[in-house]
Structures are given as C-alpha cells and as structure tokens.
Amino acid sequence: MRSHYCGNLNKSLAGQTVELCGWVNRRRDLGGLIFIDMRDREGVVQVVVDPDMKDIFSTANQLRNEFCIKFTGEVRVRPDSQVNKDMSTGEVELYATGLEIINRSEALPLDFNQTNSEEQRLKYRYIDLRRPEMSDRIKLRARASSFVRRFLDENLFLDIETPVLTKATPEGARDYLVPSRVHKGSFYALPQSPQLFKQLLMMSGFDRYYQIVKCFRDEDLRADRQPEFTQIDIETSFLSSNQVRDITERLVHDMWKELLDVELGQFPIMKFSEAIRRFGSDKPDLRNPLELVDIADLLKDVEFQVFAGPANDEKGRVAVIRVPGGASLSRKQIDEYGKFVGIYGAKGLAWMKVNDRAAGLEGVQSPVAKFLNADVVNGILERTEAESGDIILFGADKANIVSEAMGALRIKLGDDLELTDKKAWAPLWVIDFPMFEEDGEGNLHAMHHPFTSPLGMTAEELKVNPAAANSDAYDMVINGYEVGGGSVRIHNAEMQTAVFGILGIEAKEQQEKFGFLLEALKYGTPPHAGLAFGLDRLAMLLCGTENIRDVIAFPKTTAAACLLTNAPSPANPDSLAELAIAVKFAEKKDA
C-alpha cells in the first residue's frame, strides 16, 4: 500500500510518484486549494489537493483529523518563499493524484493541542501513542534495544532465554504468583530477575550471556518504577568486576554516542561510603554542585543537645549543606524545606545565614547561633568554605536519617535554585557496597541479593563480622538514577551457605528454596559476575523525560492497573474452581 513514509520525503525524490499511508494531522482550505498535513510514525508532510482534481478534491473535503488515509501523488519542491523550516519535510510537498479514505475517525477523546490528564492518556493509549512526542520516544527505545543486541552480539555474548514460570526466591520484593492447574495448591512465581538461571548458565559453560527480558515485582510504585519492567540482563564467566564494568561502560558510552551524539567520557568510580558522606545517596547526581559536609567533631562539646547528642553517638551524624547565595531565602522558604526533610524522618532543619564572613560569629544570623561559640562558628564557616551571602543548613540525627534527608534536600535545592545543570550528563560507578544492612531490629539483610560475593573475605572471616563486610558489587548511576547494578557472584557452596546462615535462612529452608543452586555449586562452578540494566530507565534518560511511563507503550498506573484493558479484574469462578482457589476477603474490624 505504501512506497514511502511521510517523514522521509525530501528533494531527492522530486518528480517521483509515491504512495503514502497515515493519518490526517490537520486540514486547511486556502485560496481554493486544500492542504492536508499527513502524518505517520516518521513525521509529517504537506499534501496539496487541487480543485481541478474533482474526485480527489471532493473526497478531501470530507477529511477530518485522524482519518486513516492513503495519498498517491508527485513529490514537488516548494518555492523558496514557501519552505517550512519547522518541518523536516518542509522543502517538499506532495501534489495529490489519488486519495483513499481507509477508515474514518470519530471525535477524539484526546486533544493533541492541549495537555490531557494522564488517566485519559493511559485509557486511550493507542491514540496517545500517535502523538509525535510519544512516537519518537517509543522509536528511540526500539533503537536502544537494537543497539544493545548488536553491541553484545559483536562482543560474543549469546542471547539465551530463561523461564518465566519459575520458583519463588527472596530477592527483596513480593513475587507475582501464578497458580498451577496441574499441581493444585502449588504456585509458580514470575521472575523478579533471571538471577539464578543466568548463574546456572555460567555453570553450564555459556561464559557470556545476555537477554532483554521482562521482570516482575509486586512492590509500591514510583514515577520510575513499574510492576513489569524490562532488564538488559548480562552475565559473564572468568571476568573480574573491573572487566564487567569496562564492557558495560563501553555499551552505554557507545549507545549515547550513536543515539544522542553525546560523548560521555570515562566514568568516575566512587565508593559507597564516599557517596553517602558527600551526597547522602548511593546514586548521586553529580550535576548538582552541593555537597554534605560533616561537622560532628566540631560540635561534641556544645551544650545544644540537638547537635551534641548525634555528634557523640557512633550511629549519629551531623552534616551541613552550604548553599551559595542562599542567605536570600525567606523564612517561609526555609520553613518549607524544614517540612520537606520531615518526610524523611528529620525532626527539623537548623540554619545559619552568613551575612558577613569576615565577622565570624557576629556576622551570622541563626536561631542556633546563641548555642555556639566563636570557635565553633568559625570552624563551620572554614570547613564549608562559606562566603558572605550563603546559607548553611544543618541535619543532626541518626546517620541514616541525616544522610537520606539531607541527600533529598540537596536534590531539591539544586532543582529549586537552578543549581543543577539539566543539560549535562554525569555518569559514575558506585562500588564497594556494604554486604548487609540492618532492618532496625538488628536483623541483617542482603543489600543487593544473597548471591553477591563479599569483597576479599573468606567464609569464616565473613561469619565472624558480617556487618563489617563489603560486597564486590557495583551500580552504574547517570544523573542521579541507578540505571544498572551488578556484582561478582558467590561461586562455591561454603560461601553461599555461610551467607544464607547470616541472613537467618536455616539449613532446611536453604535446601527447600535453593537446593538446586547449592547442588550445582558442587560441580566445578566458574567464577562469574554480571550486571542488569533497566531498559525502561535508560530509555527514560535518553528521551529526556522523568516519568518511566512515557517510554513504555502500554504502562500500568502507580496502582499497578491498566486503564486500557481494566486489568487486573476478577477471575471467572469456573477458572478459580479448576485451580482449587477460593477468594476470601479479610473482614473489616469494627472501629
């Protein structure tokens, strides 16, 4: 039906007869001529319908926006005075010699010229995706997927599929369960990742594996998360963590160069401890110049217990952010920032305006200045390199609360005060994560997953002091988003059993849940390491949007619902009976 795409017409085709299929983007009647802006996935071209072509002209009079049509015609070069520089096809137009209305359209539930609610856009997603902005995003995502496959194929990786119906394993989030009709009362789990299967592939001798794969997590959603998401899953044998990072960094570097013509340069490497200390986050946005500065040692002897308490607590932290020019912030603005850090558990936000740096204590304005002597104030000013006109914002509490609250405040200040360079790209690697983290009740949990290898420790050493262990893990971060994470894996049964034991998984449970893995580790398992990228997140960054739903053709809402199909929905009672499942809702308790 079609010989060319609308958006691909140019002067080199002048004089040729072409056939185009697409949609009416706009219709105009001017000076007896009808002009149709015709659109397909590649762009828009202007079609001219001459009244001398009576049958075509009569049909063109019936056209309305979003009619699906086919035009046949001659490509003509526009006069210089009529060139439209705002269109990629603006140097040419199509002189119509044939027109077919393939399908008419009713009035649209979306208005392409206005901002529509996200609910409407998701309900009528098939129409929303016709918008050039959305179409361009989906196409760029497709190009990214194609690039990944080409790059990994060229680097000797094998594309191998792993099961979707599998066994539930503890990987940090709830599983989506699928009941078995054959094995009544038993359930499959949809994979949160192909983690164990890709490790088994390494044990099978396939030393370079990849897969672009759907994964599923039943967790609370955010703007950059979905219940089903796509991973670029990678695993290797006989490569160190440095070598895995080198390959995957080249993949992203070359992707940005090919798709955006952006040179990312070499990615800096930062330890987890440094990232938390300087930025309050293990995924720092390095485009933002603000940093956290620790000052606990300066405050140990002050009488103000809000500062002295955390300063003398080994699990406490006192850190500040110096905001250049921030002395101009109003009290109302500062109070709003105080409410903001409260979201993260902070009890308040102390502040100090530096009106005259040279005057020391006498030159600052602060509700807490009366609790501090001149030496302490001068020490804070010196350490933060404060200047006249700056403001210093204080966080004092348990270390995790201060890091999270002040890290989030740093991002907000960078956005609000336009300190973050939104046009820049700032990738980095974060390495040497803690092996375990506490849950608040003294129990240890794997920070990544329980198959991650500790860094430079034997199984016996790990058992002696697990809380002090670091893992051979690494995350790739771009502009404050974790786009990929990986690690060296445990490749012997002794270490894997030790890690399970530290996590409170008893021997019987180990066999029930991971017996197949522990058995496989007995048979010459090679050292192996890997990484998984979030394709949705990579596409989000490539497209310059902050909402992951913008780069997924048919996404779910933050309530994990599909407004287009009304999924999830109640199951047919007969289907439930066949599965031996009864649905019972918890009874509401009286207030």
From Swiss-Prot:
This protein's record includes keyword Aminoacyl-tRNA synthetase: yes
Predominant subcellular localization, coarse grouping: cytoplasm
Protein's cellular compartments: Cytoplasm
Residues annotated for L-aspartate binding in this entry: 171, 217, 448, 489
CDD domains for this protein: AspRS_core, EcAspRS_like_N
Group of enzyme by EC: ligase
The EC number(s) this enzyme carries: 6.1.1.12
Entry-linked SUPFAM superfamilies: Class II aaRS and biotin synthetases, GAD domain-like, Nucleic acid-binding proteins
NCBIfam families: aspS_bact (TIGR00459), PRK00476.1 (NF001750)
Record family assignment: Belongs to the class-II aminoacyl-tRNA synthetase family. Type 1 subfamily.
Protein name per the record: Aspartate--tRNA ligase
